[in-house]
Amino acid sequence: LLKVRDVADFGCGPGWYTYLLYKQGYKVNGYDGNPHVKEMSSLLFNDGFYCQYADFTLPISVKEPFELILCLEVGEHIPQIYEDVFIQNLVNNSKKYILLSWAIPNQKGWGHVNCHTNEYVIERMRKYGYHYNLSTSAILRKAASLFWFKDTIMFFERH
């Protein structure tokens, strides 16, 4: 779908998606809110690859923005009071694309404190200059193997 060279995964967990992209030759960085993510990912992959800690409730600035920010099922874990900072972290560190999923109301899961409808998230991203790409989102939703992504994957492009 896209020809990007560099990707950041915000909320990468132990780094599975990040590592897969790394092995495919992408320049990729993974960031997670778990303060032990570096040790966890270093042990898991055991080849020098690791992810980094980031507190998404505080402003984050990377050296150079990434072409694509991947952020899957993270926003619902961020208290609403920090939602603006969280979204700003996505848009400020992206050159062009954001692939985002955000748990919808009543979606099962642990630690969900800030679920939103797709429409709400699309409008929030629009205010930051990101356009919802319906056709790319539909392709990704159809291809998703995890059922919740079929309702929550949203692909955004900077205007």
Question: Residues of each region from the PLM?
Answer:
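S-adenosyl-L-methionine-dependent methyltransferase catalytic module, highlighting the catalytic core
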Residues: 12-16, 20, 33-61, 66-71, ...
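Glycine-rich helix-loop-beta junction characteristic of Rossmann-like nucleotide cofactor-binding loops
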Residues: 1-3
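Conserved class I S-adenosyl-L-methionine
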Residues: 5-13
